Amino acid sequence: MLFRSLVDFWAEWCGPCRAVGPILEEIAAENADKITVLKLNTDEEPSIAMKYGIASIPTMNVDVNGQIAKTIIGARPKPALLKELEAFL
């Protein structure tokens, strides 16, 4: 069985992060049986962001069974995010 998660690296002051947040919440609700969406505030957890090499936000890492399978950098509208995530949903 595959375990899929999407980790959204974000910060409160980041406008694009705040724009993509509700979109990710919708995707999470619509695909709850396929992927888990987690949020990590880079201001509150800088060491974790550094560990994953996060240089700009928003950055979304798709993890499949403990391995990063895809990285998406920057805000996207919902249709574009769904297209990037289609292999995981």
Where are the regions a protein language model picked out?
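Structural cue for short, hydrophobic secondary-structure segments
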Residues: D8-W10, V62
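Hydrophobic heptad-repeat coiled-coil signature
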Residues: C14-C17
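Conserved short-loop catalytic and cofactor-binding motifs
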Residues: A11-E12, A69
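Short, internal strand/loop/helix patches
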Residues: L38, D43, I48, N61, ...
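Thiol-based oxidoreductase modules, predominantly thioredoxin-like and allied folds used
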Residues: F9, V20-A28, A32-S47, I54
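Short, small-residue-biased leader/transition segments that mark boundaries at the very start
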Residues: M1-L2
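Non-catalytic, surface beta->alpha helical segment in thiol-disulfide oxidoreductase systems
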Residues: S56, V62-L89
